Regions:
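A generic "binding-loop/recognition-motif" signal
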Residues: 45, 70, 114, 189, ...
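Short, hydrophobic/glycine-enriched beta-strand segments
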Residues: 3-8, 39-40
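Conserved acidic, metal-coordinating active-site core of Asp-based
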Residues: 99, 105-221
Length: 273
C-alpha cells in the first residue's frame, strides 16, 4: 500500500498555464482523506505554491509536508516549519553565480531560504514566473557578498536552448569542482545547481524516514530530468504522458493523460482510491 505521493509541480501537476485543475485538487483531497500524504516536490520556493496548497486543502496544515528547491528544504506546512535545510556552501554558490553572471544571455536566479533574487531578468522568463505566481527581487549589483549570511538553497540559469544550458554547466564546472554539485535541467528552460547529494529523491526518502514510510511505499510523479532522482528512489515511479524520454524510461507507469488533462488524478484514482 502506498502511503505518500511526492509530485513535481510545473508540467506535471500543473497545467501549462500554471493553474491547478479542479479534478487534480479533488483527487489530492480524496487521497489525504484516506491518510495518504501528498507532498509537492518542486524546484521552486515553497512561497510560490501556497495558493495551490490552499486549493488542495493542505495549506498551513499540521502533519502535511512540502519539499522545495529540488530537495534543499523540507517543511511541515503548518507555519512552514523547516524540518531539514540542505543549503549550498557559500564558496560553491559564489562560484556558480560568477559563471552565471558572466553570460549576458542568462537570467541567473539565486534562491535563498525565503526569497528569489534574479540577476539580469529576461522578459520570457519573468513572464513564465509571473504566470506561476512566483515573485522575485531584481538584483541591481552582481556583488554576491550580500548572501554571505543567508542560506542559498540553489542557483539556476534560464537560457533558451539546451545547447546554451549545457555550455553553462561546462562554464560552472570550470570554476566549481563538479563533485560539489548536483546538476539538473527543468521546464525546457533552466539548468539547476544544488549542492552535491541534494536532490528530489534524497529529500523524498529523508521525509519518508521522518514519517516512518519506506521508499517502497512512496509514489513519485514527474516529467523532467530534475525529477529523475525521485523516480529512481521510490517504489512506484510515474511519468506523465508529456514527460521526457528519460523520465518515461525510468517510470513503472506512464499516464495516459498529460499534465493539461489531469494526469495526477489518473495516478491517484488508479493506485490510491
Amino acid at each position: 500500500m502506498y502511503k505518500m505521493i511526492v509530485c513535481d509541480l510545473d508540467e506535471t501537476l500543473m497545467n501549462d498555464d500554471g493553474t491547478l485543475s479542479e479534478k487534480n485538487a479533488a483527487a489530492i483531497q480524496a487521497a489525504a482523506a484516506k491518510g495518504v500524504y501528498f507532498v509537492p516536490n518542486s524546484g521552486r520556493s515553497y512561497t510560490s505554491f501556497q495558493n495551490d496548497l490552499e486549493t488542495m486543502g493542505l495549506r498551513d496544515q499540521p502533519h502535511q509536508y512540502s519539499i522545495s528547491y529540488n530537495g534543499g528544504l523540507i517543511l511541515e506546512n503548518k507555519d512552514n516549519r523547516p524540518l531539514a535545510v540542505n543549503a549550498m556552501p557559500y564558496e560553491v554558490a559564489k562560484g556558480v553565480f560568477a559563471a552565471g553572471i558572466a553570460n549576458q544571455q542568462a537570467a541567473t536566479h539565486v534562491y535563498t531560504q525565503d526569497t528569489l533574487y534574479i540577476y539580469n531578468p529576461v522578459p520570457s522568463d519573468s513572464d513564465y514566473l509571473q504566470n506561476r505566481g512566483v515573485t522575485f527581487t531584481t538584483m541591481t549589483t552582481p556583488d554576491f557578498e550580500q548572501f554571505k549570511t543567508m542560506n542559498v538553497m540553489k542557483i539556476i540559469m534560464a537560457l533558451p536552448t539546451m545547447t546554451d544550458r549545457k555550455q553553462m554547466r561546462a562554464d560552472v564546472e570550470a570554476i566549481v569542482d563538479p563533485s560539489k554539485l548536483a546538476v539538473t535541467y527543468s521546464s525546457d528552460r533552466y539548468v539547476e545547481f544544488n549542492p552535491a547529494g541534494v536532490d528530489k529523491g534524497t529529500a523524498a526518502v529523508q521525509l519518508g524516514k521522518l514519517l516512518g514510510i519506506t521508499a517502497d511505499e512512496i509514489i513519485a510523479a514527474g516529467d523532467n530530468s530534475n525529477d529523475l532522482p525521485m523516480l529512481k528512489a521510490v517504489g512506484l515511479p510515474v511519468s506523465v504522458a508529456n514527460g521526457i524520454d528519460a523520465v518515461k524510461a525510468a517510470a513503472k507507469y506512464v499516464t495516459v493523460a498529460d499534465n493539461n488533462h489531469d494526469a495526477l488524478a489518473e495516478v491517484i484514482n488508479k493506485f490510491i482510491l
